[in-house]
UniProtKB/Swiss-Prot annotation:
Tagged with keyword Ribonucleoprotein: yes
Family named by the database record: Belongs to the influenza viruses nucleoprotein family.
Protein name, entry field: Nucleoprotein
Record motif Unconventional nuclear localization signal, residues: 1-18
Localization of this protein: Virion; Host nucleus
Subunit structure, interactors included: Homomultimerizes to form the nucleocapsid. May bind host exportin-1/XPO1. Binds to viral genomic RNA. Protein-RNA contacts are mediated by a combination of electrostatic interactions between positively charged residues and the phosphate backbone and planar interactions between aromatic side chains and bases.
Organism: Influenza A virus (strain A/Gull/Astrakhan/227/1984 H13N6)
Motif (Bipartite nuclear localization signal): 198-216
């Protein structure tokens, strides 16, 4: 993309940094994940967790959620102003699983938020380390993306469930900052904007007064974030129109849904980063690894390396398949929920199955589930190759359509053709002439119709051996292009209920 020079890299967003050179970025990202690791070790000490209990991904998630809740200022304020019976707004906690007499037992722990904040700051050289918190949010978001599909949420906002590949980051909290905005898919941004417009239509005061001014600024900022994800001039021009609308209403909603559909072929640029559970960083720090000195990148070989030699366990329900649970977590770690399954399979070195074929439910265990029947197993999170994560949705050939497949948003920078059923996608565009910007629409539809398969390839680097840390010898895999490669395709995954 031509505007690359003006953009901060992911890592700069992630660490809130100004312009830094590659070494400084690696060091500050290293400092961030090292802080997460130190915090995790300290929490394991506080909770008196054994080594094995500390490697349990469910315990990791509980500890991550506790620190996120301790720093959620808006919610904390709200809880203090609206006290609910039997809940202490100053405390946070969750289920911790321990091994007792050969069984896993659940124990609910409760901590002062102040105490958690103190431990977190202490692990992060006395700073709030917001970047580390955002990093944990993105890991939770990636886990949700791999576990649930958002059909119901899509239908509620008037979008088509076939757009699920555009929904990356749809469960990220609003407070996730620039790093969070970078990983949100086109569909996620469209959905946030539609919800906002609907509120404005139903509540006349939404855009008025001092609050309304702030709302308007937020609206325009979200429009600009979405505009920045589009790679063609016509899509961007349409976004300008949506942003400049005096009082956004149904015409804007129609335009946004149109743009979301167009993103199935004219893909948006969405960032991908490998965010690992806190316990993985904890294990590395405990073994004496100095992240800040060694440097770390979320989009290179480092996360693959880290997963090659960390042992993480998960609780397994009676009829779940441990290999399937491993795949789910592997996909979450690499933000690969919307990647082509053939690319993921090649990199992982094991067949990656569509969601509907997995015998596994989510990673977290509900409080009413019976612990008597729970077993645990080691997650297989290793890979055969590694590849650079991409922020591009595909390549625009001479500003023509970069096209893709109805249900893939590339995660890895690996060259492939993106097969897509143009008929399926174009069918989504028939018979809706609402919204006003007909010339831009015509232009966008023309680009989509003219996208030839060769414009539709994704030119990436290829994959690399795990010994090739400088990415010198790309291996370009050849894929059997006859198979549909998407994860949620024809699927019955559970819904994510917020």
């Amino acid at each position: 993309m031509a505007s690359q020079g003006t953009k901060r890299s992911y890592e700069q967003m992630e660490t809130g940094g100004e312009r830094q050179n590659a070494t400084e970025i690696r060091a500050s990202v290293g400092r961030m994940v090292g802080g997460i690791g130190r915090f995790y070790i300290q929490m394991c000490t506080e909770l008196k967790l054994s080594d094995n209990e500390g490697r349990l991904i469910q315990n990791s998630i509980t500890i991550e959620r506790m620190v996120l809740s301790a720093f959620d200022e808006r919610r904390n304020r709200y809880l203090e102003e609206h006290p609910s019976a039997g809940r202490d707004p100053k405390k946070t906690g969750g289920p911790i699983y321990r091994r007792r007499e050969g069984k896993w037992v659940r124990e609910l722990v409760l901590y002062d938020k102040e105490e958690i904040r103190r431990i977190w700051r202490q692990a992060n050289n006395g700073e709030d380390a917001t970047a580390g918190l955002t990093h944990l949010m993105i890991w939770h978001s990636n886990l949700n993306d791999a576990t649930y599909q958002r059909t119901r949420a899509l239908v509620r906002t008037g979008m088509d469930p076939r757009m699920c590949s555009l929904m990356q980051g749809s469960t990220l909290p609003r407070r996730s900052g620039a790093a969070g905005a970078a990983v949100k898919g086109v569909g996620t941004m469209v959905m946030e904007l539609i919800r906002m417009i609907k509120r404005g239509v139903n509540d006349r005061n939404f855009w008025r007064g001092e609050n309304g001014r702030r709302t308007r600024i937020a609206y325009e900022r979200m429009c600009n974030i979405l505009k920045g994800k589009f790679q063609t001039a016509a899509q961007r021009a349409m976004m300008d129109q949506v942003r400049e609308s005096r009082s956004p209403g149904n015409a804007e909603i129609e335009d946004l849904i149109f743009l979301a559909r167009s993103a199935l072929i004219l893909r948006g640029a969405v960032a991908h980063k490998s965010c690992l559970p806190a316990c993985v960083h904890g294990l590395a720090v405990a073994s004496g690894y100095d992240f800040e000195r060694e440097g770390y990148s979320l989009v290179g070989i480092d996360p693959f390396r880290l997963l090659q030699n960390s042992q993480v366990f998960s609780l397994i329900r009676p009829n779940e398949n441990p290999a399937h649970k491993s795949q789910l977590v592997w996909m979450a770690c690499h933000s690969a929920a919307f990647e082509d399954l053939r690319v993921s399979s090649f990199i992982r070195g094991a067949r990656v199955l569509p969601r509907g074929q997995l015998s596994t439910r989510g990673v977290q265990i509900a409080s009413n589930e019976n612990m008597e029947t729970m077993s645990s197993s080691t997650l297989e999170l290793r890979s055969k190759y590694w590849a650079i994560r991409t922020r591009s949705g595909g390549n625009t050939n001479q500003q023509r359509a970069s096209a893709g497949q109805i249900s893939v948003q590339p995660t890895f920078s690996v060259q492939r053709n993106l097969p897509f059923e143009r008929a399926t996608i174009m069918a989504a565009f028939t018979g809706n002439a609402e919204g006003r910007t007909s010339d831009m629409r015509t232009e966008i539809i023309r680009m989509m119709e003219n996208a030839r398969p060769e414009d539709v390839s994704f030119q990436g680097r290829g994959v690399f051996e795990l010994s090739d840390e400088k990415a010198t010898n790309p291996i370009v895999p050849s894929f059997d292009m006859s198979k549909e490669g998407s994860y949620f395709f024809g699927d019955n995954a559970e819904e994510f209920d917020s």
